[in-house]
């Protein structure tokens, strides 16, 4: 792909120039405290390189899903403080997105300074379906860095969105892929274009409908496709099994039956399930065979025999993609499935396999369960973007950089 990199921009020279960076700083918060700083840490290399080179750096990012207007609970203030801490330098926070405070602060930047704009989604034009509205916001963002400025796309978690700060600004400024986006695209290309076999895919999460396109796409490419998490129950139901009060997408049962008919030699389902009476951390766990789930109980994790079988498949793999937990890993009693599969992937990686964790809940599980992040070849910052790439979809935020 003909995408210019951050190194290209640095070679051209950025000292004294305004550089607009779209980062992905959408981290989970609990009462104002950041519970997983992974995306903040991942954004540091690009921002540090630009600051060190003397650029006047203006960062735009979103947090959560505000409704197109300022909302204090979605302010980037705690994120800005954490970002400054990780960078080891002061990060200014503008009081607005492209208003008078942002403009005044941008004009006052000196070489190497970093300004973080307030949550870009406080401006409804960011996510507008109206091209003209998005373009107006993009032009206002460009004004903050000047006509001789540049745009660096470094928020991989949003490149599947056609939004003002992701797509439209790249049509107005010289544009480059940041370190993170550059790495992510190369990693995903390795999964799709130069895959060493055997290729194992592990998919979890709650809904088949969320993963249907990627299942259909990867089932034709993978040697084994392991299904866990809440969505396994719709597959079990498609086999005619009772799943008790487990999560079930009835509208997807026929689709799952077709997938099993077409790809039964590739798809692997759990053979035992950890069940409980209710969705609660203090529910009493009980392990049962997958065809013996009681009517009054719900599945909250895969069982130990499933972990053993899945681990055997993974131990021989040369390429592994994992997206989605095997169970409710947030509850310790139902975390063993996710941890066991993750440890098997780490073991395979140690033997030379190329492993990618596809962002989202999987990345959160790695950190929450205390697993070594360097035990995997790559942990993606973009769950949805990774899946859409592997579905074969064009990502607007990548295509516009070409």
From Swiss-Prot:
Annotated residues for binding of ATP: 211, 299, 330, 359-362
Assembly and binders: Monomer.
Family, similarity comment: Belongs to the phosphoglycerate kinase family.
Pfam family name, one: PGK
Top enzyme class: transferase
Cellular compartments per GO CC: cytosol
Source organism of this protein record: Mycolicibacterium gilvum (strain PYR-GCK)
Residue sites binding substrate per the record: 24-26, 39, 62-65, 121, 161
Entries under PANTHER family matching the protein: PHOSPHOGLYCERATE KINASE (PTHR11406), PHOSPHOGLYCERATE KINASE 1, CHLOROPLASTIC-RELATED (PTHR11406:SF23)
Reaction equations catalysed: (2R)-3-phosphoglycerate + ATP = (2R)-3-phospho-glyceroyl phosphate + ADP
CDD domains given in the database record: Phosphoglycerate_kinase
Enzyme Commission number: 2.7.2.3
Compartment list: Cytoplasm
Main location group: cytoplasm
Keywords for the protein's UniProt record, in alphabetical order: ATP-binding, Cytoplasm, Glycolysis, Kinase, Nucleotide-binding, Transferase
Pathway participation: Carbohydrate degradation; glycolysis; pyruvate from D-glyceraldehyde 3-phosphate: step 2/5
Protein name per UniProt: Phosphoglycerate kinase
């Amino acid at each position: 792909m003909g995408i210019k990199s951050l190194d290209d921009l640095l070679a051209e020279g950025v000292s004294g120039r305004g550089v607009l960076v779209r980062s992905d700083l959408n981290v989970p918060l609990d009462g104002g405290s950041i519970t997983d700083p992974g995306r903040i840490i991942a954004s540091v290399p690009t921002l540090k390189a630009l600051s060190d080179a003397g650029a006047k750096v203006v960062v735009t990012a979103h947090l959560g899903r505000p409704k197109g207007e300022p909302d204090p609970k979605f302010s980037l203030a705690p994120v800005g403080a954490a970002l400054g801490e990780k960078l080891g330098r002061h990060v200014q926070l503008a009081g607005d997105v492209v208003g008078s405070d942002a403009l005044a602060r941008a004009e006052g930047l000196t070489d190497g300074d970093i300004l973080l704009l307030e949550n870009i989604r406080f401006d409804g034009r960011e996510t507008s379906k109206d091209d003209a509205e998005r373009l107006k916001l993009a032009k206002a963002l460009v004004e903050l860095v000047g006509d001789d400025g540049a745009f660096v796309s470094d928020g991989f978690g949003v490149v599947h969105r056609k939004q003002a700060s992701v797509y439209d600004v790249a049509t107005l400024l010289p544009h480059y892929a940041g370190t993170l986006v550059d790495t992510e695209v190369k990693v995903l290309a390795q999964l799709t274009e130069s895959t060493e076999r055997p290729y194992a895919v592990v998919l979890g999460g709650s809904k088949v409908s969320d993963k249907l396109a990627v299942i259909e796409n990867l089932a034709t490419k993978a040697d084994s496709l392991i299904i866990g998490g809440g969505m396994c129950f719709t597959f079990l139901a498609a086999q005619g099994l009772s799943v008790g009060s487990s999560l079930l997408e009835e509208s997807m049962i026929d689709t799952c039956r077709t997938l099993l008919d077409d790809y039964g030699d590739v798809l692997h389902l759990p053979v035992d399930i950890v069940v409980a009476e209710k969705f609660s951390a203090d529910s009493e766990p009980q392990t049962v065979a997958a065809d013996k789930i009681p009517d009054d109980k719900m599945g909250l994790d895969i069982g130990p025999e499933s972990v053993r079988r899945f681990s055997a498949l993974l131990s021989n793999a040369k390429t592994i993609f994992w997206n989605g937990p095997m169970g409710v890993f947030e509850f310790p009693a139902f975390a063993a499935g996710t941890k066991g599969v993750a440890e098997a992937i780490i073991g395979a990686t140690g033997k030379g396999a190329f492993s990618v964790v596809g962002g989202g809940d999987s990345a959160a599980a790695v950190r929450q369960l205390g697993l070594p992040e360097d035990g995997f070849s790559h942990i993606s910052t973009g769950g949805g973007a990774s899946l859409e790439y592997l579905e074969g979809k064009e990502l607007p935020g990548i295509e516009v950089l070409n």
